[in-house]
């Protein structure tokens, strides 16, 4: 529940949280407006900025551009695409389609190619370093390539329940575990803040 997730985030000291449930063509028009409604209800009542969004999941690459556009039209201020994680059989070409569509974040992009890293940088699409088990097995590759070629990185919890929320210390450890030096960690947090600020301007 968004209310519970936000309450737990507030108790953990979060300043902002994106509510980005998994969506596809079957539920996007139901989920996003309801998350938007919940975020509006909480505004001014909680010490956390609540950003309504969506994670477009297992969509054929050919549909992703229209789905990103449709999600924004429904009120999603933060649009994520479920990338080519090694933990699931995500269709090849999803990473490229997400970048072309101008998603805010490409989640767990797996063994992302150099070409897609460069394109993500060009399109200002951030790549996710994830704290979630399974999806995180390619964190090292994503981090190494992003640092080498200058792509933006964010750290995400990929929370599916309130227990998945992590502390700042845990986030730092996940980043260091991916091979990101301490001197770059602040840049990752700054990118996350910038994305949230941009998303809040869409509300």
Which residues fall in each region the model found?
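Metal-associated gating/positioning segment near the N- to mid-region
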Residues: 1-33
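Catalytic cores of alpha/beta
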Residues: 3-5, 62-70, 168-172
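Short acidic/histidine-rich active-site segments
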Residues: 22, 151-165
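Mid-to-C-terminal alpha-helical segments outside catalytic/metal-binding sites
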Residues: 173-203
């Amino acid at each position: 529940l968004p209310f519970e997730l936000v309450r737990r985030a507030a108790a953990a000291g979060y300043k902002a949280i994106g509510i980005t449930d998994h969506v596809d063509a079957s539920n996007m028009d139901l989920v996003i407006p309801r998350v938007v409604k919940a975020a509006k209800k909480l505004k001014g009542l909680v010490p956390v900025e609540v950003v309504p969004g969506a994670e477009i999941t297992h969509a054929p690459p050919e549909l992703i551009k229209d789905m990103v556009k449709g999600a924004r039209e429904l009120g999603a201020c933060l649009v994520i695409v479920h990338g080519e994680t090694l933990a699931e059989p995500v269709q090849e070409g999803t990473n490229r389609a997400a970048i072309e569509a101008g998603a805010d974040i490409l989640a767990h992009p797996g063994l992302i190619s150099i070409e897609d890293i460069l394109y993500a940088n060009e399109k200002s699409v951030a790549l996710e370093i994830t704290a979630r088990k399974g999806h995180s097995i390619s964190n090292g590759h994503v981090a190494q390539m992003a640092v080498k070629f200058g792509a933006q990185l964010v750290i995400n919890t990929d929370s599916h329940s309130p227990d998945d929320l992590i502390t700042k210390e845990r986030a730092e450890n996940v980043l260091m575990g991916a091979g990101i030096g301490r001197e770059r960690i602040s840049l990752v947090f700054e990118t996350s803040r910038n994305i949230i600020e941009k998303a809040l301007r869409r509300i």
